[in-house]
Amino acid sequence: MALQRPKGTQDHLPDGSPKLSRDVQASAFAYVQDTARRVLERAGAQFIATPLFEEAELVRRGVGGSTDIVRKEMFTVYYFGDHGGYVLRPEGTAGIVRAYLQNGLKQLPAPLKLWTHGPMFRAENVQKGRLRQFHQVDYEALGSADPLVDAEAIWLMWEVVRELGLTGVRVKLGSIGDPADREAYNAYLRDCFTPHAARLSDDSRDRLTRNPMRILDSKSTGDQALIGELQVKPMLDFLGEAASSHFAAVQAYLRAWNVPFDIDPAIVRGLDYYRRTAWELHHQGVGAKSALGGGGRYDGLSTQLGGPEVPGIGWAFGIERLLLALEAEGVTFPEESGPLLFLAALDEEHVARAAGLALEGRRVARVEFAYRALKPANAFKEADRRRARYAGLLGSDEAERGVLTIKHLASGEQQEVPLAALNTFLAERAR
């Protein structure tokens, strides 16, 4: 049997590849990353990169031992001789906060805005929009508890999808309060669900003792039916004065900036480190609960990791899920452009010289060349196949006169360019 890529992964392929599966074009992937980078760096966010694997204890303490990620979805790395307790990262925030604490980034001006992108790993049940290796764009703002920072984070996430051209996106906004608020709410939920525990799914019965709020996020239709039947009160009814005031301020900022949102009292983020502001972006084109991504405030995460208290807020969206939404709306992205010039020798004697001219030309533009001599018609055909803007020919006649015959493929116009002026010709057209 032919070797296959692992289940729950994708190949990122060059433009023009035959579409045989759900693999993605690398240029579309890069376009999403570049759009996010442009939006976030205009806001002052700086790029950070952390390892693809971290200590398992970091993930357990950061993400939370009661989460599905820790209990069911982590990929453990066993084969390091010096340490057996590593896992492939299932999300980005815990690693970024670890890097912030370990490297003394608290000395930098606050809020410190950081962003990254890269692969994450979870042992998911593979379906549309859910992969075992997936890629995220991640934004974090550390060092401020101001609700204005929350609103800016939501605006930035909204701005990325707006610049990509998506229109069918909804922001679902909620608050999960402070720790005391959540403790009171969890007590209320235990009182609600304990008499009906036999009707809960196995996962939710386990959550009843560990973290009852996670029952509200259950994928079981039976659990959701029971929640409706019991008319379970939302977390918003249990917000204390401080959390309630914070939530109202976030909403006021978003309204002032014309960011459309819906209050969703059922918002329960899947990671234990969240508090206060929480939100998700939804689109019906991505399947699997329709979430493109989400975020929230996590002021207690740094202390869970053994550091001083550092307020923070962040978000992440899945690039593959965003591509599904773009596909569903028929949004197209620019394909990777071809070379400015494709250069070919007309006889074997001049192949090396043509290649040398191409190498010199690469100092100012993208230039490709033929690795063997071609007839003019074949050179033009190959240049067109590579989506080049110009085709250049070097034969005995051109070499003797010190020129290059250059054809503009779209118009068919031809001209001769002195070899010594080739880089000037390219630089003028590469702008």
From Swiss-Prot:
Keywords: Aminoacyl-tRNA synthetase, ATP-binding, Cytoplasm, Ligase, Nucleotide-binding, Protein biosynthesis. It holds the Pfam family HGTP_anticodon. Its EC number is 6.1.1.21. One of its GO terms (molecular function) is ATP binding. PROSITE patterns: AA_TRNA_LIGASE_II. It catalyses: tRNA(His) + L-histidine + ATP = L-histidyl-tRNA(His) + AMP + diphosphate + H(+). Residues 1-20 are annotated as: Disordered. It comes from the Bacteria. InterPro entries: aa-tRNA-synth_II, aa-tRNA-synth_II/BPL/LPL, Anticodon-bd, Anticodon-bd_dom_sf, His-tRNA-ligase, HisRS-like_core, HisRS/HisZ. GO terms for biological process: histidyl-tRNA aminoacylation. One of its GO terms (cellular component) is cytoplasm. It is found in: Cytoplasm. Belongs to the class-II aminoacyl-tRNA synthetase family. Homodimer. This is Histidine--tRNA ligase. The gene is hisS.
